[in-house]
Amino acid sequence: MVTKYSSIFMSPILSNPPILYFSDCSREXYQKXLTN
C-alpha cells in the first residue's frame, strides 16, 4: 500500500511543474527567480 500511495502522489508531482502547486504569491516569486 505504501508504494501504491507513493506512486499516486509522487507521479503527478514529478510529472507536473512544482509551480502548479504554489499559491499566486509564491508563483510570482518563483517566476521572478527564474527570469532573473
From Swiss-Prot:
Highest taxon above the source species:
Eukaryota
* Variation of activity with pH: Optimum pH is 7.5.
On tissue specificity, the annotation reads: Expressed by the venom gland.
Question: Where would I find the Peptidase M12B domain in this sequence?
Answer: 1-36
A Gene Ontology cellular component where this protein is annotated is: host extracellular space
Subcellular localization: Secreted
Judged by the first EC level, this protein's enzyme class is hydrolase
The record's account of how the chain is modified after translation: The N-terminus is blocked. Glycosylated.
| MF terms (GO), sorted A to Z | metal ion binding; metallopeptidase activity; toxin activity
| rRNA-binding found in the keyword field | no
The reply to whether Signal figures as a keyword in the UniProt entry is no
Per UniProt, activity regulation is:
Inhibited by EDTA, but not inhibited by iodoacetamide, PMSF and pepstatin A.
Q: Name one GO biological process term.
A: venom-mediated hemorrhage in another organism
* UniProt entry keywords in alphabetical sequence: Disulfide bond, Fibrinogenolytic toxin, Glycoprotein, Hemorrhagic toxin, Hemostasis impairing toxin, Hydrolase, Metal-binding, Metalloprotease, Protease, Secreted, Toxin, Zinc
Q: What is its EC number?
A: 3.4.24.-
Binding note for cofactor: Binds 1 zinc ion per subunit.
List, separated by semicolons, the cofactors it needs. Zn(2+)
Q: Which protein family is named in the record?
A: Belongs to the venom metalloproteinase (M12B) family. P-III subfamily. P-IIIa sub-subfamily.
Q: What does this protein do?
A: Snake venom zinc metalloprotease that exhibits strong hemorrhagic activity. It also degrades alpha-chain of fibrinogen (FGA), but not the beta- and the gamma-chains. Possesses potent azocaseinolytic activity and cleaves insulin B-chain, hydrolyzing it at positions Ala(14)-Leu(15), followed by Tyr(16)-Leu(17) and His(10)-Leu(11). In vivo, subcutaneous injection into mice induces strong hemorrhage.
Q: Indicate the quaternary assembly.
A: Monomer.
Q: What is this protein called?
A: Zinc metalloproteinase-disintegrin-like VaH1
**Species whose genome carries this gene:** Vipera ammodytes ammodytes
List the top taxonomic levels of the source: Eukaryota, Metazoa, Chordata, Craniata, Vertebrata
